């Protein structure tokens, strides 16, 4: 049995009772990484020397002070688009291959305050653009459940590392499903918080109006611990919300009697596999047995979500990624005769194909003559999608459906057809456009591959999302399954 089979609350008890040390936890993490990461390929950088030194320091602090952080001694992996001082941050892109940040992201500072131990940086799709982690500029992460399948994306490294037992928890980012989709594919728990709940300061921007950092864990309880540690307003991020952060752990009561669930007919329609539908219907039976009720509803503008998302996110990306020009930091070409050539060659050589595709799409959508037809219209449709959610939430507590239309697909299966790859996020994207919170929890298997149940809540009501997810988790055994590597 791995130490990481214990929840945070149990690990903290073992540490305080001196049954294990923090150094033991960190040793367990690096031992497992050295055993299996050659197969899984989840990590891009390890911070072994510093992590071991910090673990010793915390072990000593156990005797010298009474107050300890919320995540005291807990090992964590961080997605490689979240900046970490003096620990290379590449966004899995050649253009940032040797970039060492000079500051920590706010979430990293908050992890330090909570006294978590950073193990290393995790692989991802380049600049978070992708659904399979095949767009990384450095390596392809594999799904621990079947090494021939993708772990999902863009936080594929974050989900795979947790599923493989390399770290007990990780941070990812979610722009159109990039936490929930890999969590579903890898059989772990992944939450996208409400937009503004967690500071984006130090998150390398893909689409600023959609990006949100969130936790990936083995259990709902651990997920609540992590969100507790990283949430709250931040003066360095004007989009972070000045809204009180509740005690998420107190929401895990197991009581969902009288809870009203909405199930959008669009989420169980065309393109959703029979296994995904059945796993959701089985999950609804479990929730009914616990006292909740459910009804079918409609989110009529969901069919426009994919097109809306790719216009808006690509437009924002084309602006955000303009800063990578080879002048101030990052890769710089040796093949330029003048400044214009320097920009052109640096970006052509430094960015991967998917990133270039989205920059071009976004630049086109924002260009004179097309702005009204594409970008402005997409913003209007986004408002309609947000209103659909508000209308449903006027009468229901949560919305439930599958996280993904299918389980994980084979590596290389969709790389030649971007549209089929994009369609994989069709059930997660509307949540980002509406800015509401959503979680994926394990709810079954298809052909030995995990399936995820998506639970969506009202703005800033992560507590109810956690309450439902925890009640379902406690009534089932799906989250206890582990891949064999």
Curated annotation (Swiss-Prot):
It holds the Pfam family Amidase. InterPro entries: Amidase, Amidase_CS, Amidase_dom, AS_sf, GatA. The active site is at 79 (charge relay system), 154 (charge relay system), 178 (acyl-ester intermediate). It catalyses: L-glutamyl-tRNA(Gln) + L-glutamine + ATP + H2O = L-glutaminyl-tRNA(Gln) + L-glutamate + ADP + phosphate + H(+). One of its GO terms (molecular function) is glutaminyl-tRNA synthase (glutamine-hydrolyzing) activity. Transmembrane segments: none annotated. One of its GO terms (biological process) is translation. The keyword Protein biosynthesis applies. It is an enzyme of class 6 (ligase). GO terms for cellular component: glutamyl-tRNA(Gln) amidotransferase complex. Keywords: ATP-binding, Ligase, Nucleotide-binding, Protein biosynthesis. Its EC number is 6.3.5.7. Heterotrimer of A, B and C subunits. Allows the formation of correctly charged Gln-tRNA(Gln) through the transamidation of misacylated Glu-tRNA(Gln) in organisms which lack glutaminyl-tRNA synthetase. The reaction takes place in the presence of glutamine and ATP through an activated gamma-phospho-Glu-tRNA(Gln). Belongs to the amidase family. GatA subfamily. This is Glutamyl-tRNA(Gln) amidotransferase subunit A. It comes from Bacillus licheniformis (strain ATCC 14580 / DSM 13 / JCM 2505 / CCUG 7422 / NBRC 12200 / NCIMB 9375 / NCTC 10341 / NRRL NRS-1264 / Gibson 46). The gene is gatA.
């Amino acid at each position: 049995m791995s130490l990481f089979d214990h929840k945070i609350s149990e690990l903290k008890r073992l540490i305080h009772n001196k049954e294990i040390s923090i150094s033991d936890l960190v040793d367990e993490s690096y031992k497992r990484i050295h055993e299996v990461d050659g197969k899984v390929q989840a990590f891009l950088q390890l911070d072994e020397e510093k992590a071991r030194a910090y673990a010793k320091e915390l072990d000593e602090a156990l005797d010298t002070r009474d107050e300890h952080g919320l995540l005291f001694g807990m090992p964590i992996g961080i997605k490689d688009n979240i900046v970490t001082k003096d620990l290379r941050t590449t966004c899995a892109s050649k253009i940032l291959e040797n970039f060492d940040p000079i500051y920590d992201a706010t979430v990293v500072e908050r992890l330090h305050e909570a006294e978590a131990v950073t193990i290393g940086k995790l692989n991802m799709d380049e600049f978070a653009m992708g659904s399979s982690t095949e767009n990384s500029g450095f390596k392809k992460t594999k799904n621990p459940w079947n090494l021939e399948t993708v772990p999902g994306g863009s936080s594929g490294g974050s989900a795979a590392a947790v599923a493989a037992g390399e770290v007990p928890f990780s941070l990812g980012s979610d722009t159109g499903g990039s936490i929930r989709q890999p969590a579903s594919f890898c059989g772990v728990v992944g939450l996208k918080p409400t937009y503004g709940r967690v500071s984006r300061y130090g998150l390398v921007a893909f689409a600023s109006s959609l990006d949100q950092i969130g936790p990936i864990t083995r259990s709902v309880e651990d997920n609540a611990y992590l969100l507790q540690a990283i949430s709250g307003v931040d003066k360095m991020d004007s989009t972070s919300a000045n809204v009180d952060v509740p005690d998420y752990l107190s929401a895990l009561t197991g009581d969902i009697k009288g809870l009203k669930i909405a199930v959008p007919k669009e989420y169980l329609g065309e393109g959703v596999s029979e296994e995904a539908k059945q796993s959701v219907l089985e999950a609804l039976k479990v929730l009914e047995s616990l006292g909740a009720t459910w009804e079918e509803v409609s989110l009529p503008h969901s069919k426009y979500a994919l097109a809306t998302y790719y216009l808006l996110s690509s437009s924002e990306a084309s602006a955000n990624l303009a800063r990578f020009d080879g002048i101030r930091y990052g890769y710089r070409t040796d093949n330029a005769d003048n400044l214009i050539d320097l920009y052109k060659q640096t970006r052509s050589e430094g960015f991967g194909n998917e990133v270039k595709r989205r920059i071009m799409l976004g630049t086109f959508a924002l260009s004179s003559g097309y702005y009204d037809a594409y970008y402005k219209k997409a913003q209007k449709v986004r408002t309609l999608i947000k209103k659909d959610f508000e209308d449903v939430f006027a009468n229901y507590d949560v919305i439930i459906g599958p996280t993904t239309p299918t389980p994980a697909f084979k590596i290389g299966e969709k790389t030649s057809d971007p549209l089929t790859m994009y369609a994989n996020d069709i059930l997660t994207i509307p949540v980002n456009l509406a800015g509401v919170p959503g979680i994926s929890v394990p709810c079954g298997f298809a052909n030995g591959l995990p399936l995820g149940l998506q639970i969506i809540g009202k703005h800033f009501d992560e507590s109810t999302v956690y309450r439902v997810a925890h009640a379902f988790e406690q009534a089932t055994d799906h989250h206890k399954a582990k891949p064999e590597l």
